[in-house]
Amino acid sequence: MVLSEIFRGNNEVREAARAGMQIDTVSVASASDAASAADGSGKITGAIRPSAVAGSFYPADRTALKQLINQQLDYGRKLLQQLEPTLPAGVPRAVIVPHAGYIYSGTAAALAYALLERGRGSVTRAVIVGPTHRVAVRGVACSTAAAFETPLGTVPVDIAAERKALGLSVNEPLRSGTHARPGAPAPAMIVNGPTHAQEHAVEVQIPFLQTVLGPDLTIVPLNAGDATPQEGGCGHFLGDNHAAIPWL
């Protein structure tokens, strides 16, 4: 099943998404497929979006953040061991997780991320689709940033994948106000830097993803407004290697 089929056929998932649940879609991509905002030297080329909620939604101190995440993941791993006989095999293609502060919902998120940890070494790109709390959008908005920064380090954005979804040329810059070209895979996608600047829903997922998927991670951060799954084009980012999608 593809993401759009699940949204069409699963009312519980649809209602959870409307209620503000964070949706994280993860695709398995090779290093060549998951082109990022890094140049040949591995350096980030472009603007880096700094952490907006470190120190409030999660610890700003790197050591304290790692300790908290590992504590929450350990709890999730223990629960998964008990559930192992009933779980599908393989790496999940998508998980639904909350986006509150870690002391409130981190343990619930950690259960999903402990399951996603199966993909460490094979999953190199995470597509993070979340709601907006500060700057509303119509459609699905990608960022103008080349990377997102957290206390655990800087994660490159897969700008090449965003350009493809928007129907842009290879070297066309991502400027706020840009809309998808006619016939683009994601017709409702736009570029909107301000909606990402202070938004926490996507950001709070990144430290967990850095921890469970490792240093080769790239991300596609998306803020979702009014758009159908088909218009948003999330399926475009999933690639050709499909697996079962458990929704948590």
Question: Can you annotate each of these PLM segments?
Answer:
Residues 12, 16, 32-35, 62-63, ...:
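Short linear sequence elements within intrinsically disordered, low-complexity coil regions
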Residues 1-34:
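Generic low-complexity, intrinsically disordered segments
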Residues 42-248:
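Active-site histidine-anchored catalytic micro-motif
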